[in-house]
Amino acid sequence: MLTNKQKYNNAFIESFSINENVLGNDISYNSIPEWDSIGHMSLIAVLEEVFDIMMEMDDIIDFSSYKKGFEIIGKYGVKF
């Protein structure tokens, strides 16, 4: 069974078609070509499905980095 962090990482890997070694606290919106507005909505959709949550619009907008995402997803009761 995957941990929540593995599920979180897999959402990025699946949404952006990137390798896990690209992930880290410095990855953020528009820091890689794949994380544009279309990629952002894909990521949000995958995260909502994987964690069975529905994010508020403010949280979708504030989801600006890999690191910030942990905080935002945590607001919905997901523990990392």
Model-derived features: positions:
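Phosphopantetheine-dependent thiolation modules in NRPS/PKS and related acyl-activating systems
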Residues: 2-35, 39-45, 50-80
